[in-house]
Amino acid sequence: MNKNTFEPGLSLLRQPVAPLVSMVQFLYLTGPFATVAEVVGEMPEPIETELAIYEHPVALLREYLEFLQPLESLKSEQEIGEDVVDEQGEPVDRMTAVSALVMQQVLTAELEKINSRLCGPCNCTLCCTGPSAGMSQEFFEIPLAPREIDLFDVDRCDHADSRAHRARDEEELYCDGRPFYRRRSPGLFHWQNGWSLILPRGAQCPNLEAGSGRCRVYAQRPEVCRRPQIFPYMLERLDEPRAGSPVYRLRQTLLAVVDCPYVRELQDDIARYAAAAELHLAWKENKS
């Protein structure tokens, strides 16, 4: 596949915002600035880093200004409302926690734009179909927020038994006397950890147009569908809150799904993006 096909997304991938965010944080904490917006407004133009030249860094940073606001809590001592722990479960220092929470939000927003531009030219339905006959998986799961479930006109499974299970529990949920994934058509399931659309073997998303492969609800598509197949894993949300506050484990990883055509094609560029964000890069297969 010609790399020119990916130019709209590739141009963004090659100008990662993470180095600029790190500059803003440093300048804000070491300078006489009352707000992060002041720092952004005084950034020089252009800015050249080891990996990229940013002709208009101020305009770029302003796209993410709302996600940078928590940095101001580092000067005000305002509570951030989330706890972050390391791999051993020990709390990290305040600056590490705030920096990670900010970067997770920034990278999530940035990669939504990048993935959306890279995905279109591939005419790929990898994320929209269940496993094929030769794959080891029995089903494909698309996690959904409660507000997204009405996008799918399929059968629902929502009862005490389903809400006591998770899709990948060793002790499987049974529906109508058989494992939940042994069905011919997609279904919505309300699990212990939320809702998801289950695509069994050979099934496809009900919003996928036959023949064209277009998504009927593209403009309103679920959040998880907006972020294939490169996504930030700065933080992993844990199930056990502390005193009612969300708890996250620091991961500092970028995940890239190698089943995806553009991920396979752009591995070097993705590696440079991860390096710019100072993230460990993990390649993984979603289906096999």
Predicted segments with their positions:
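Short loop/turn segments that flank or connect secondary-structure elements
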Residues: 1-288
